[in-house]
């Protein structure tokens, strides 16, 4: 542990004020300590020092003109963290909370998530503190074109392939891709999450949510449980939450609550997903509109969604949204399983509480890997100049998620932590990347 502790202390000292990056690195490094101790070659080669330092961190300004003719300037980021097993791969996040520490945390997590998929993709992440909410289509286009005018220098189908994340959906990907193509003249798979008319993949929108539920299904089965007849609470109302709800419902669960950034809905009869899709995907409005479709449902702007009793909880909104007190409430109300659809949505003390109480817990880097897995399948289709059917992509996704579960379960058991999927996911993701780094020398 002394080597691990030394690396962590050095990381914290060299990256002050980046709390979420410290949190992510601490969780991973502490859980892989048994592997490090069993393999002295990792320390000799400085694997941890190299793994926790990005290959490069790109920071740039993004000037654009709003609808009033005023010049606005945002910060743009792309952190290319590790490409030992493939080109950098990870989303772009547009949100006021974005800073270098947030992007580094997301990029670091992406290394292990991408490794777990079994596909040849490295880890990266990017974004900006630009807020697309309340902006016109023209303003979003102006921002995206300016952002790509700088980013295009650093990305490419075999170099770095960004995708969507919070604030970046089909509209934004379209604007970004159009500008890349205009500047470079290249029609290549440089972005994933593209529209179906210009190289996108069927099932990409559904992938993260579906993948989460596929993995949860495997995990529940280890205890003789399933989604059938279970009450499910899901935070968020974006792609991950909506399609996790859709697949959980298909497996016999009853989704009773969803939320967005202004409030949450509770529908004892089961959430009407058609209404939610209309509100969020078509009208781009708030969940408060849900009562117009289901008058008997409840809408709350106070309290938290985790107060709703449930059997299965799926945090799918944002990092550190589920705290210790929320975990204690869920445990008291009889939750049996928690799966992270967002990136690091549970605080460390919340995770510890779930594990101590015997609640099945699926960490984000495994549970939400379906999105990036299907992005990699989109890359494959672009390279092959083919388009697979929805069923074929979904079948491949299901196989990948089963494989991820089996990997992390086996790794946890091998190192004496059977049933601890946090440790299992970290170890399984780490070993593949570390061994590739060893093979490639000190680079």
Residue ranges and their predicted role:
Residues 2-24, 219-220, 331-443:
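Adenosine-phosphate binding glycine-rich loop
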Residues 19-22, 38-47, 118, 155-164, ...:
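Flexible, glycine/charged-enriched surface loops at secondary-structure junctions
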Residues 41-70:
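Structured beta-strand/loop patches that form or line metal/cofactor-binding pockets in enzymes
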Residues 95, 114-228:
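Glycine/serine-rich phosphate-binding loop and adjoining beta1-alpha1 elements at the start
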Residues 192-195, 200-309:
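Glycine-rich phosphate/diphosphate-binding loop of Rossmann-like nucleotide-binding domains
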Residues 263-361, 366:
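Rossmann-like adenosine-cofactor binding region
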